[in-house]
């Protein structure tokens, strides 16, 4: 079991080193992909330093950050509340270009409105099924807004 953890730490270090070039600002090609991709795949960091399985999620790229609406009971939200805000975000596919970010649960009503507007266009084929859940969820606390700021 110790060997597996060691291997995971080595993999994590390799990912960290591969993202070093984007530590201060996202590469222009990555920004372009964020502006055109339908999905991001978010892995949150576990207590032991390993990464969760990437989860596909709808997102908004706005003012240099990635925003998602999620259940406050989701692992990504729980880990942020528990002081582990670090995430790895892959763009477009699980093995797409990726960067590290810090998540924060935020109260930004204007950004929520922007997110809902963008989702209505970006995910038009499925929006009718989910719109009420998103709108009511942000109002009654069944959804929280997470802002991921690139490291």
Give the label of every model feature segment:
Residues 23-27:
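Boundary at the C-terminal end of the N-terminal hydrophobic targeting segment
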Residues 73-151:
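Short, structured beta-strand-loop surface elements
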């Amino acid at each position: 079991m110790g060997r597996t953890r060691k291997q995971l730490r080595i993999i994590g270090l390799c990912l960290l080193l591969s993202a070093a070039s984007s530590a201060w600002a996202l590469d222009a090609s990555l920004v372009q992909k964020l502006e055109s991709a339908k999905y991001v795949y978010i892995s949150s960091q576990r207590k032991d330093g390993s990464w969760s399985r990437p989860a596909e999620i709808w997102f908004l790229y706005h003012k240099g950050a990635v925003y998602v609406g999620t259940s406050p009971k989701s692992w990504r939200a729980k880990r942020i509340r528990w002081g582990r805000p670090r995430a790895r975000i892959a763009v477009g596919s699980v093995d797409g270009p990726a960067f590290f970010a810090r998540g924060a649960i935020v109260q930004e009503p204007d950004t929520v409105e922007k997110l809902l507007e963008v989702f209505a266009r970006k995910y038009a084929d499925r929006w009718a099924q989910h719109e009420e859940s998103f709108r009511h969820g942000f109002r009654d606390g069944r959804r929280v807004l997470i802002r991921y700021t690139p490291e």
